[in-house]
Regions:
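N-terminal export leaders
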Residues: 1-3
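Noncatalytic regulatory segments and standalone regulatory/sensor domains
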Residues: 10-59, 63, 76-79, 95, ...
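Active-site-adjacent structural segments surrounding the nucleophilic cysteine of cysteine proteases
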Residues: 12, 162-258, 310, 327
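Conserved active-site-adjacent core of cysteine acyl-enzyme catalytic domains
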Residues: 62-63, 72, 240-376
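Contiguous beta-strand segments within globular domains
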Residues: 64-87
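A short beta-strand element within beta-rich, extracytoplasmic domains
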Residues: 79-93, 161, 302
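Histidine-centered active-site/metal-ligand motif
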Residues: 96, 221, 318
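Extracellular carbohydrate recognition and processing domains
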Residues: 111-152
């Protein structure tokens, strides 16, 4: 029997297209530009349920706040769901933050809401964090990903955004929300041929090594990849400033790391980019982005001996930047695990790398670009 093909889906709502009008609003409203904000006249008054958590942080702000919520329409997947990863782009001024939830319909029954993160762009008011210890008979949360226990009868979901204001005046302003969803990751993925007309192209993205920073750089692959992309799109700060600022901007105080996919996309969004987590079924799906001059942050993992020319012997989960394809279609990747900046750009064998990209990370990428910059059809 042939293996079931890997399937992925994506849904997004953008304020620029008026798409939050589809959401159910309770204590929130739409600003004139379509962004989702708190409605001070209708928001509830609440206090932090866990002001003293392990590690010296609070679940929210440690005190009182106003909160409203917005719930998406029911989204039906064309295939049984296995994993879901949310993204959002929002401004969160000091005194404002947001919380992201997902729930899934199992048969005719809805699960409870799973918490996929409490977010603000800085730590003046809250300590941004994922939420651990969320496992039940229906699903579990692994930092940034909702994982279903069984995908046999789960083909619908909803997203919830809760918006918070410490003073009832400052408000988050959400301009985009999205969910990437997928079927079970393929153990032995079916590799699809690419299109040679997209090959033999290399986007020049300044190389940045994570390994030159002795104070934690060995685990900074994701923010270092962001730093490379930010430099490409015009942030003219030096390499180290871009890296260290990104490291601070994506840190998850519960996960105690920098690899939260959703937080990385949210941080890029906070810097003014269109940014979201996407899952694809093949490397070929990324070729049009390279053709459109959009470098793509890619996730993959490998055991020792699985990736020829790898910058380090192995990794359970790693992020790097796809910057092009050589004349044979092999991916050209700025790999921050290189020991120095000048060794970051590498070309990996397409079959080897794509297999690891799909089987170990489910084809997960960050799409980050200037607003409105899209590949040609």
């Amino acid at each position: 029997m042939a293996a079931t093909p890997y399937q992925t889906g994506f849904i997004a709502w953008k304020s620029s297209k008026g798409e939050f009008k589809e959401w159910e609003l309770n204590g929130t409203r739409l600003a004139p530009d379509g962004q989702l904000v708190i409605d001070p006249s209708a928001a509830a008054f609440e206090t932090d349920p866990m002001p003293f958590m392990e590690g010296g942080i609070s679940f929210y702000n440690g005190g009182a706040f106003r909160v409203g919520e917005a719930i998406s329409p029911v989204i039906t997947s064309p295939f049984p769901l296995d994993e879901l990863v949310p993204s959002w782009n929002a401004d969160t001024p000091t005194g404002a933050w947001l919380e992201v939830g997902l729930r899934v319909r199992v048969g005719e029954r809805w699960t409870g809401w799973y918490n996929l993160g409490v977010w603000a762009a800085d730590t003046t008011t809250i300590s941004r964090h994922s939420v651990s210890d969320q496992t039940d008979a229906d699903a579990s949360v692994s930092t940034d990903t909702l994982i279903l226990q069984s995908n046999s009868d789960t083909q619908a979901f909803q997203m919830r955004l809760r918006l918070f204001s410490a003073d009832g005046v400052q408000t988050p302003a959400v301009r985009m929300a999205s969910v990437a969803f997928s079927s079970p990751r393929p153990i032995t993925p079916e590799l699809k041929p690419g299109n040679p007309r997209y090959w033999n192209k290399h986007i020049l993205v300044q190389e940045c090594s994570q390994m030159i920073y002795p104070d934690g750089g060995n685990v900074w692959c994701s923010p270092t990849s962001l730093a490379m992309v930010f430099g490409y799109w015009g942030w003219n700060a030096g390499r180290e400033e871009r890296v260290r600022t990104s490291v601070a901007g994506v840190y998850d105080h519960i996960y105690q790391g920098h690899g939260n996919w959703s937080f990385n996309a949210a941080y890029a969004g906070a810097r003014g980019f269109d940014a979201y987590v996407l899952r694809v079924t093949s490397l070929a799906e990324l070729e049009p982005w390279i053709a459109a001059d959009v470098p793509v942050v890619v996730s993959f993992g490998w055991r020792e001996g699985q990736l020829s020319g790898a910058a380090i012997p192995s990794s359970n989960g790693h992020l790097a930047v796809l910057v092009g394809f050589d004349s044979a279609g092999n991916p050209i990747i700025n790999d921050p695990a290189a020991p120095s900046d000048d060794g970051v750009c590498r070309t990996y064998d397409r079959r080897e790398w794509e297999t690891l990209f799909l089987s170990r990370a489910g084809g997960t990428v960050y799409i980050i670009h200037k607003p409105g910059w899209l590949p040609a059809a």
